[in-house]
Amino acid sequence: MRISIFGLGYVGAVCAGCLSARGHDVVGVDISSTKIDLINNGKSPIVEPGLEELLQKGISTGKLRGTTDFAEAIRATDLSMICVGTPSKKNGDLELDYIESVCREIGYVLRDKATRHTIVVRSTVLPGTVANVVIPILEDCSGKKAGVDFGVAVNPEFLRESTAIKDYDLPPMTVIGEFDKASGDVLQSLYEELDAPIIRKDIAVAEMIKYTCNVWHATKVTFANEIGNIAKAVGVDGREVMDVVCQDKALNLSQYYMRPGFAFGGSCLPKDVRALTYRASSLDVEAPLLNSLMRSNTSQVQNAFDMVASYDTRKVALLGLSFKAGTDDLRESPLVELAEMLIGKGFDLSIFDSNVEYARVHGANKDYIESKIPHVSSLLNSDFDQVINDSDVIILGNRDERFRALANKTPEGKRVIDLVGFMTNATSEDGRAEGICW
């Protein structure tokens, strides 16, 4: 394929070297004549192991060249990758001047280009940037229509400096955000020879995936550091702790706790978070991330309440009261907290949970109910159909399989709030079901 790459920094230079090495005809474009001279002489504009050899091969075989002439590069190619920087502004927002400038240059050339051209945003941009910035500029400057006259896609990169060549050749996945199927097809053809799954999504989803991955990596580093700091303060080697923690692939390093949804609860997690952060504080160990966990958890309960309150009705069914399906344990259940908030604000609440029957609650659960919701016996109803029929808003609170059907086929005249991810799609067909995170 004939490819032009705009921006020859870390991402652009690596892409130019790797794509030309795989037989594609690549034109590297940059406003810096110094970078272009380096490329055309087979020299790397950045320090990256193995890159200079790829660039030399590309130049010697005629598969790679560099230019400062934007228009010539666009006319000579079928696909353009935008790899320019998106640095931070002082307020933390992204500086999009470079992307906007490149899009204008591409758009002006597309106005007179007869063949279809595909524009791929490889730069890291916030969700909505392509839809609200890139496409409008391209359409305005070209006088053409995205998805009809030219293609648009997003292709987030997962390259790490110092291992970028290996990361390109052996990616964990290839993410394609496509404005239209034809654009996705063109981009997919570049990566089919790589041994990695190709995941095609909408553009905004692809934009968000990149940020989610990077923020998750930052979170893991911060988490490990805070655990290490606390461990050292109590005389433990934090490396030993994390080595063992990372051996658990069923829970610790898995999808199990990585599903967006409702707050955590139960007799362990809240208690243990509080205990560890208290100990850290008593030892004068700073743990900002860990200290934020309970606040964030409480905020998610508030989000669920706000969703209920947004509807013009007071009759609410809460399906599930225990913190998870298959147990009657109500200790620190976020659903109990939600029920308490609803009752306190005057909602007419009915609760169904087959595992929680007041007459059979003993010990800690009985004490917990009597201290948090003394009148819970009058709110619990073992008649599932009656609870549904007597409500206007139905909250799916835990993953009891009996609740699943309500997420995708909302009863007539009802609203459903899904806290657990039973909804098959982000929106229900009738528009009367809504997820807390989707």
From Swiss-Prot:
UniProt binding sites for NAD(+): 10-11, 30, 35, 86, 124, 271, 331
Keywords, ordered alphabetically: Alginate biosynthesis, NAD, Oxidoreductase
Pathway where it operates: Glycan biosynthesis; alginate biosynthesis
Residue numbers binding GDP-alpha-D-mannuronate: 161, 210, 214, 217, 225, 256-257, 259, 262, 265, 324
InterPro entries for the chain: 6-PGluconate_DH-like_C_sf (IPR008927), GDPman_DH (IPR028358), NAD(P)-bd_dom_sf (IPR036291), UDP-Glc/GDP-Man (IPR017476), UDP-Glc/GDP-Man_DH_C (IPR014027), UDP-Glc/GDP-Man_DH_C_sf (IPR036220), UDP-Glc/GDP-Man_DH_dimer (IPR014026), UDP-Glc/GDP-Man_DH_N (IPR001732)
Catalytic activity: GDP-alpha-D-mannose + 2 NAD(+) + H2O = GDP-alpha-D-mannuronate + 2 NADH + 3 H(+)
Coiled-coil regions listed: none
Top-level EC class as recorded in UniProt: oxidoreductase
Enzyme Commission code: 1.1.1.132
GO molecular function terms attached to this record: GDP-mannose 6-dehydrogenase activity; NAD binding
Active-site feature positions: 268
Single Gene Ontology BP annotation: alginic acid biosynthetic process
Its biological purpose: Catalyzes the oxidation of guanosine diphospho-D-mannose (GDP-D-mannose) to GDP-D-mannuronic acid, a precursor for alginate polymerization. The alginate layer causes a mucoid phenotype and provides a protective barrier against host immune defenses and antibiotics.
Cross-referenced PANTHER family: GDP-MANNOSE 6-DEHYDROGENASE, UDP-GLUCOSE 6-DEHYDROGENASE TUAD
Family: Belongs to the UDP-glucose/GDP-mannose dehydrogenase family.
Full protein name: GDP-mannose 6-dehydrogenase
Organism this protein belongs to: Pseudomonas savastanoi pv. phaseolicola (Pseudomonas syringae pv. phaseolicola)
Primary gene name: algD
